[in-house]
Amino acid sequence: MRSDTITQGLERTPHRALLKGTGLPQSEMGKPFIGIATSFTDLIPGHVGMRDLERFIEKGVHTGGGYSFFFGIPGVCDGISMGHKGMHYSLPTRELIADMVESVAEAHRLDGLVLLTNCDKITPGMLMAAARLDIPCIVVTAGPMMSGRGDAGRKYSFVTDTFEAMARYKAGVIDDAELARCEENACPGMGSCQGLFTANTMAILTETLGMSLPRCGTALAVSALKRRIAFASGERIVDLVRQNITPRSILTREAFENAIRVDLALGGSSNTVLHLLAIAHEAGVELPLETFDILAKETPQLASMNPAGEHFMEDLDVAGGVAGVLKQLGDKIHDCPTLMGLSTKEIAASLKGVDEEVIHPLSNPVKKEGGIAVLFGNICPKGAVVKQSGVSDKMMKFTGTARCFDSEDKAMAAMMGGVVKGGDVVVIRYEGPKGGPGMREMLAPTAALMGLGLGDSVALITDGRFSGGTRGPCIGHIAPEAAAGGPIGLIEDGDTIELDIPARSLKVMVSDEVLAERRARWVAPEPKIKKGWLARYAKVVTSAHTGAITTAE
């Protein structure tokens, strides 16, 4: 075992002494050493329940014949960090998390890892570490929050109800009392935000990839089932160490295609494009951005999930969860191994039935195409991403007038000040991985558009990204980004922009000659942040179309 490096032989006397200083008995010295990477924090509702799950994982490890050690991993809440300087840090923490897990596991020669995670960037960061290390690992996602409850049976969703409520209040649609009800009821307790936002989408994709146990992706944070899954994951990691089953044997090209199809079928968060590309890179799997669009054209959307639809995670779990989606997709799914031991199709076949009001059959899809589309054009020669499941039929094709802003903050001020009107295309740039830096989420602007009643008359394009809670005609991940000299930085107020999602096209209607003249005048702006982690990040991060990964090149 890897841990023999620190437990066996005369030369390791000092190492054993230090381990015994933690309370480790001599009798446990030869057992598999299992690291429990926990992202517990009481700053985030998605992570406040992890102390309980830690105990169940620990019990499982010891029942399985291993010896466990806890180590801490940071977590950032995208909701709390939204709309201010904090959002610059969200995506970069994904890289920090992967590096921290790698560092602790390698420094202490751990034999296997249980990765306890939940919210947006923590789960992909953990998966990136697992793929990079390629030692036995299993993921436990802490589970979704229950929907909020209001008067007359109303259900509240944190993302759609609170962020859009601000704009509705500003527009006079709701009063002080209703705004207060939203705030009080939107988050009833522990768990990740209730709809198919980034955290829950990534939990579902983790299960689909085979890196967590069945139902882990949808079992509610408050459920006893989640605790049993945590215990079983602790037991299972010891078996994985003994059998030397490692992540790269699970994270194959076919497994990634399964994850993309499930993502498309559910209408999941567009952030998953960034994360799956990054995880695939760590796993040594070639996964071009175009793969998402190729699969979208042949994978219908089978569920109508909040934020764009009516169903919450609690509904999806009861309807059949990930296994239910796999079952409905049928032959579109590859039969891949999972950490549980059963194959993907064996897990799907074990499900007795599916609630087809929630997870539709292929014969009766919600939409003919999957939830994510990849666009190209003279604004985005290396690609852009739109969550088409959240776009109304009216806005699938749209021509409008450019209104340009060089930051999210300036765009928000204009929207809330009534400057943006129907027929506009809001262009938010210099918010990409390098330019942001950190590729901030644009939930506040998109929620403002919906709340102000402009969702069917204004489009938004950006080299930043969007929250899983975003809905409406919002195109992100534009590559190359403005800070790298991308064409989005050459658009001027008054230009005509043509969006055609069915044709996968996004263009500014000016000639190549005009764009060349503008490029000759373009000057790269000064970095917004010149010291600290974000300054270093901006120098090494790649484009959105490659997953916004950091490289040594």
Curated annotation (Swiss-Prot):
The lineage of its organism: Bacteria, Pseudomonadati, Thermodesulfobacteriota, Desulfuromonadia, Geobacterales. Pathway: Amino-acid biosynthesis; L-isoleucine biosynthesis; L-isoleucine from 2-oxobutanoate: step 3/4; Amino-acid biosynthesis; L-valine biosynthesis; L-valine from pyruvate: step 3/4. The modification N6-carboxylysine is found at residue 121. Its EC number is 4.2.1.9. PROSITE patterns: ILVD_EDD_1, ILVD_EDD_2. Its cofactor is [2Fe-2S] cluster; Mg(2+). Keywords: 2Fe-2S, Amino-acid biosynthesis, Branched-chain amino acid biosynthesis, Iron, Iron-sulfur, Lyase, Magnesium, Metal-binding. This is Dihydroxy-acid dehydratase. HAMAP family: IlvD (MF_00012). One of its GO terms (cellular component) is cytosol. It catalyses: (2R)-2,3-dihydroxy-3-methylbutanoate = 3-methyl-2-oxobutanoate + H2O; (2R,3R)-2,3-dihydroxy-3-methylpentanoate = (S)-3-methyl-2-oxopentanoate + H2O. The active site is at residue 467. Belongs to the IlvD/Edd family. It comes from Citrifermentans bemidjiense (strain ATCC BAA-1014 / DSM 16622 / JCM 12645 / Bem) (Geobacter bemidjiensis). It comes from the Bacteria. One of its GO terms (molecular function) is magnesium ion binding. Pfam families: ILV_EDD_C, ILVD_EDD_N.
